[in-house]
Swiss-Prot record:
Organism of origin: Shewanella woodyi (strain ATCC 51908 / MS32)
Residues binding heme c 2, per UniProt: 153, 156-157, 290
PROSITE patterns: MULTIHEME_CYTC
GO BP, one annotated term: nitrate assimilation
Catalytic function, reaction form: 6 Fe(III)-[cytochrome c] + NH4(+) + 2 H2O = 6 Fe(II)-[cytochrome c] + nitrite + 8 H(+)
Known cofactor(s): Ca(2+); heme c
Annotated metabolic or biological route of this protein: Nitrogen metabolism; nitrate reduction (assimilation)
Positions that bind heme c 4: 271, 274-275, 382
UniProt protein name: Cytochrome c-552
Lineage: Bacteria, Pseudomonadati, Pseudomonadota, Gammaproteobacteria, Alteromonadales
Record's GO cellular component terms: outer membrane-bounded periplasmic space
Biological role stated in the UniProt entry: Catalyzes the reduction of nitrite to ammonia, consuming six electrons in the process.
Length: 466
């Protein structure tokens, strides 16, 4: 029997079909990377997340502390290192930094695809589409037109839901390595684990089967000594230091690891308790504030939930802890800078690899420990005791290297102390290393003018098909 549809029944059928299509699309597990797609259903969270754009100031860490240029000599961070800004700037700042160079095609540039891995919900989208082998292969340029949505909703939440998720397979493997699989964790633990997808120490693998993959070095544990032992066991180095020829380790931002060791972590005060508290909007409705930031900016909703001291007291206590950490940090830097130049002098004087090996091991371990402490941005607040302990061992190991160097330099007939170049400013330190900053900056400006518009146009065309 043939059924004749009236206008009314046809319209109703079309409406039902459209509804089913929409429901089917939302039911898909595929990552939706476009953050604006969530602004209606989760308006309060979306609007507060968007306020991370207010951290407009760019703070040049190399300008503030020129020692860093020498400590990272031969590595990208000696070119450019700004303090972190809000999540809204994750993609922008990675595009603009000198560390990513000025590539003109997908085979150019100093950095691999893995450098995008914590910057965008486009990353899990690409991994879903291409697999990890496809995503991690190639240079950073390859992801330019694909990775355009900054850190947002789908990085931490299942599609269209408030339910938390880990969106990176490498992060899942990391959590499993330390016996805390995400699917078995409590919601309270998950609130920190989603942050631990990115606010962690990681490295890029160099094995043939997983070259360029991101991995957390947690196989032996998550302390500074555990990860140091792991890296030593696999003979891993991020780069060779330009002055001392030390096989170096570059710590990333082990916030999750250091948080666990502090009083907040030990009492299971989560990342969100302090950095994304529950707040009330103008209508009095509670929601999770996604303007990730300083707990002191929302003291009553964060610190005030547990502490009965005043905001002034807590702020001053935090300042005191930061000052103590900074003091030992600078002591470690002073020892390390001298050790690098003294090692360089030893090589020039004819030192052998056998003579230098124990010295370079001390420098490697000292700088790794220093970097582990300072790269964890909030360590003075999260785990001040651990920060001071680790920095103290960095000072000791750097001093051990310098004692051995003094003996070796004397043996080689080299007058001491070794003359050091003027590194009192960022520019002078970079010049001392022979870095052509004028060319690097000019190349980057050309890249921003010619390549970035091309990436954005390609991305817009692709997203129009979603």
């Amino acid at each position: 029997m043939v059924r004749i549809l009236t206008k009314k029944s046809f319209a109703l059928s079309a409406l039902v079909a459209a509804s089913l299509m929409a429901s089917g699309a939302m039911a898909s597990d595929k990552t939706e990377p476009r953050n604006e797609q969530y602004k209606d259903k989760f308006s309060k969270q979306y609007n507060s997340w968007h306020e991370t754009s207010e951290s407009v100031e760019i703070t040049d860490a190399l300008e503030q502390d020129p020692n860093l240029v020498i400590l990272w000599a031969g590595y990208g961070f000696a070119k450019d290192y700004n303090k972190a800004r809000g999540h809204m700037y994750a993609v922008t700042d990675l595009r603009n930094t000198l560390r990513t160079g000025a590539p003109k095609k997908d085979t150019d540039g100093p950095m691999p695809m893995a450098c995008w891995s914590c910057k965008s919900p486009d990353v899990p989208r690409m991994i879903e589409e291409q697999g990890e082998d496809g995503y991690f292969s190639g240079k950073w340029y390859k992801g330019g037109a694909e990775i355009v949505n900054t850190i947002g909703c789908s990085d931490c939440h299942e599609k269209g839901k408030s339910k938390l998720r880990i969106s990176r397979p490498f992060a899942e493997r990391g959590m499993e390595a330390i016996g805390t699989p995400f699917d078995k964790a409590s919601r309270k633990d998950k609130q920190s684990m989603v942050c631990g997808q990115c606010h962690v120490e990681y490295y890029f693998e160099k094995t043939a089967d997983k070259k360029g993959f991101v991995k957390f070095p947690w196989d032996k544990g998550t302390t500074v000594e555990d990860m140091e032992a792991y890296y030593d066991a696999i003979d891993f180095a991020d780069w060779t230091h330009k002055v001392s020829k030390t096989p170096m380790l570059k710590a990333q931002h082990p916030g999750y690891e250091t948080w666990q060791l502090g009083m907040h972590g030990k009492n299971n005060v989560s990342c969100t308790d302090c950095h994304m508290p529950k707040v009330k909007n103008a209508e009095g409705r509670k929601f999770t504030d996604h303007k990730v930031g300083n707990p002191f900016d929302r003291f009553e909703e964060t610190c005030g939930n547990c502490h009965d001291q005043s905001k002034e007291f807590m702020v001053n206590l935090d300042k005191e802890r930061k000052a103590k950490v900074k003091e030992i940090q600078l002591r470690a830097e002073n020892q390390l800078v001298k050790a690098h130049f003294e090692a360089g002098a030893a090589w020039k004087a004819g030192a052998t690899e056998a003579e230098m090996k124990p010295i370079l091991t001390d420098i490697r371990h000292a700088q790794w420990r220093w970097d582990y402490a300072i790269a964890s941005h909030g360590v003075a607040s999260h785990a001040p005791d651990e920060a001071l302990r680790v920095l103290g061992t960095a000072v000791d190991k750097a001093a051990d290297a310098r004692v051995k160097l003094a003996q070796l330099l004397a043996k080689k007939g080299v007058p001491q102390p070794i003359a050091l170049p003027d590194i009192s400013t960022k520019a002078k330190a970079q010049a001392a290393l022979g870095m052509d900053m004028k060319k690097m900056n000019a190349d980057k400006e050309e890249f921003k003018k010619t390549v970035l518009p091309k990436w954005d146009a390609e991305a817009k065309k692709r997203e129009a098909t979603y």
